[in-house]
């Protein structure tokens, strides 16, 4: 049996050499700040690079916190260096596992994708319902995984390393999260 590393660095920027984990932490911290500035309580799965949490443990952390939304920021990589754009993954419905969070997760994914495309002008690569992701299948709370761009595309890699572009991503995700929370509150 083959298992995944508990914490992996993911892909790296083809031009910048920036590891995915470093990029996503920077965006995650900006997102935290944007949400906290609007009065939202945020629980982070990590605030530094020195973390050894599995995807199950990350989902359990969100569950234990009673999160209204679990946002798992990632960046994409591809063997095709022309691949570009953003897409958002969310859990498909699996009876007994994700059936109660699939619909709200899809709504949060729709909001996140629309906000990311509007804020950054990135190519809309759509939504992707998944049933093979541990971080989704162990989550008891709505969860989305925005892929914020392709680090294997020279142009997007440079953009993703730009602090002002990261601010746009963080603000877009904050706007989407707030709209999701408002919709859920009724």
Task: Name every feature range the model reports, one short phrase each.
Residues 29-41, 63-68, 75, 113-122, ...:
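Sec-exported extracytoplasmic/periplasmic mature domains
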Residues 2-16, 78-105, 109-111:
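A short, glycine/acidic-enriched catalytic loop
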Residues 18-26, 52-56, 99-107, 160-171:
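Soluble non-cytosolic domains of exported or imported proteins
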Residues 1-59, 65, 92:
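Active-site histidine-acidic residue metal-binding/catalytic motifs
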Residues 103-132:
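Active-site-adjacent substrate-binding region
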Residues 21, 38-41, 69, 84-86, ...:
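Envelope-exposed proteins and targeting segments
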Residues 72-80, 89, 124-186:
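Active-site-adjacent mobile loop/cap segments within catalytic or ligand-binding domains
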Residues 55-68, 133-139:
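Mature extracellular/periplasmic domains of secretome proteins
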């Amino acid at each position: 049996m083959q298992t995944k590393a508990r914490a992996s660095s993911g892909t790296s920027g083809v031009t910048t050499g920036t590891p995915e984990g470093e990029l996503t932490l920077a965006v995650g911290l900006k997102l935290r700040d944007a949400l906290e500035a609007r009065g939202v309580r945020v629980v982070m799965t990590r605030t530094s690079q020195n973390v050894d949490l599995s995807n199950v443990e990350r989902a359990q952390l969100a569950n234990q916190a009673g999160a209204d939304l679990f946002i798992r920021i990632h960046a994409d990589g591809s063997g095709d260096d022309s691949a570009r754009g953003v897409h958002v993954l969310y859990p498909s419905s699996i009876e007994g596992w994700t059936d109660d969070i699939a619909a709200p997760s899809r709504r949060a994914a729709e909001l996140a994708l629309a906000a990311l495309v509007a804020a950054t002008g990135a190519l809309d690569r759509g939504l992707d319902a998944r049933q093979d992701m541990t971080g989704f299948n162990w989550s008891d709370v709505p969860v989305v995984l925005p892929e914020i761009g392709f680090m294997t595309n020279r142009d997007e890699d440079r953009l993703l390393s730009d602090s002002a572009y990261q601010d746009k991503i963080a603000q877009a995700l904050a706007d989407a999260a707030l709209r999701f929370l408002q919709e859920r509150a009724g």
